[in-house]
A protein has these predicted regions:
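Catalytic machinery of carbohydrate-active enzymes
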Residues: 1-191
């Protein structure tokens, strides 16, 4: 079994780009083990993805990073991918022995998809457009136990607590459903 360690220590939207890479790895190497190093901002969200076997939290402080390095050394990963391009991730990866290491070029004005395709080529893996749909590989929190109906309008993740997304479902309404909803909302508020 091949073991992959992927660094994604930034925000949720950045992880969604990495989810494409992870889904491609999983499709090409279905028996693999994938561990994602996450930040406190995206840790809970990443845990909800079925395509990720383990999520490890990267915390602040030199001592915690040294403990993390020791923990990761024991795991013995075949491939390490620094997809966030952060110096701290690159530095941690330098202390880890592996057969193969890839550092993202995302900070060099290269398209994210070009970067992902390049990484997949380095791994001798193929890219499939179906890998772009990553949300179907997520375990959503059940809302069956709610006593009252409610509506949540959410326009930007900066409006709500940093870990908000781990508790909500993205329903992706069609234009017709959205217009119908707003008409219903207008009718109810005008009474």
């Amino acid at each position: 079994m091949n073991k992959y360690l992927i660094f994604r220590t930034d925000k949720i939207g950045d992880f969604l780009i990495s989810a494409i890479l992870i889904k491609s790895i999983r499709r090409n190497d279905p028996d693999s083990f994938i561990n994602v190093i996450a930040s406190k901002e995206n840790y809970n969200y990443i845990k909800s993805f079925k395509i990720v076997d383990k999520v490890t939290l990267l915390t602040k402080g030199i001592l915690s990073k040294l403990k993390l390095i020791n923990l990761l050394r024991k795991e013995k990963y075949n491939t390490i991918i620094v997809h966030d391009g952060k110096r701290r991730s690159i530095l941690i990866s330098l202390f880890l022995k592996t057969n193969f290491k890839i550092v993202s070029n995302a900070n060099l004005n290269i398209s994210y998809f070009s970067d992902i395709k390049k990484m997949l080529n380095l791994l001798n893996f193929s890219f499939d457009k179906a890998d772009l749909n990553t949300l179907n590989n997520r375990t959503y929190v059940s809302l069956d136990n709610l006593e009252n109906n409610y509506i949540l309008l959410h326009f930007d993740e900066k409006w709500i607590h940093k870990e908000y997304i781990s508790n909500y479902i993205n329903i992706e309404p069609s234009e017709k459903e959205l217009v119908s909803f707003f008409n219903l909302l207008v009718n109810k508020t005008n009474k």
